[in-house]
Curated annotation (Swiss-Prot):
Note: There are at least 12 different components in Midge globin. The sequence of genes B and B' are shown.
First and last residue of the signal peptide: 1-15
Protein name, as recorded: Globin CTT-III
Matching Pfam families: Globin (PF00042)
Positions of heme b binding: 73, 102
Segments traversing the membrane: none
Organism: Chironomus thummi thummi
InterPro entries tied to this protein: Erythrocruorin, Globin, Globin-like_sf, Globin/Proto, Mb-like_M
Keywords: Heme, Iron, Metal-binding, Oxygen transport, Signal, Transport
Length: 151
């Protein structure tokens, strides 16, 4: 059964076309230099995500946005996401790393869906997302589908 799930995950990641991958990478290149803005959008979309981080729990998002700890954490998250985008379609190891660190923390599917929504909202506001929406949809469906199958 585990082999079947692994095979399906690999097939899903491999199903991304070269054009989809190129489109996603090009649009992400336009925003990856704003990790604080991306993390802010995600936390704003779902404060329960921010509450999962002990250094931010119970704090006002507006007051921590410009702080060094927030910037450091934003760089980590967006850096990891940059790694995933750069390695498309070969993301199985990154998915395993993500699941290994997030499953024990009790991260829910709803929170991951809300992370996705916050990220997409940021992309729509900062890029020509309409031209990349189908490629992003396929990529995010693949990424989160792989995660959900393991969590």
């Amino acid at each position: 059964m585990k082999f079947l799930i692994l095979a399906l995950c690999f097939a899903a990641a491999s199903a991304l076309s070269a054009d989809q991958i190129s489109t996603v990478q090009a649009s992400f290149d336009k925003v990856k230099g704003d990790p604080v803005g991306i993390l802010y959008a995600v936390f704003k979309a779902d404060p329960s995500i921010m509450a999962k981080f002990t250094q931010f729990a119970g704090k006002d998002l507006e007051s921590i946005k410009g702080t060094a700890p927030f910037e450091i954490h934003a760089n980590r998250i967006v850096g990891f996401f940059s790694k995933i985008i750069g390695e498309l379609p070969n993301i199985e190891a990154d998915v395993n790393t993500f699941v290994a660190s997030h499953k024990p923390r009790g991260v829910t599917h709803d929170q991951l869906n809300n992370f996705r929504a916050g990220f997409v909202s940021y992309m729509k506001a900062h890029t020509d997302f309409a031209g990349a929406e189908a490629a992003w949809g396929a990529t995010l469906d693949t990424f989160f589908g792989m995660i959900f199958s393991k969590m």
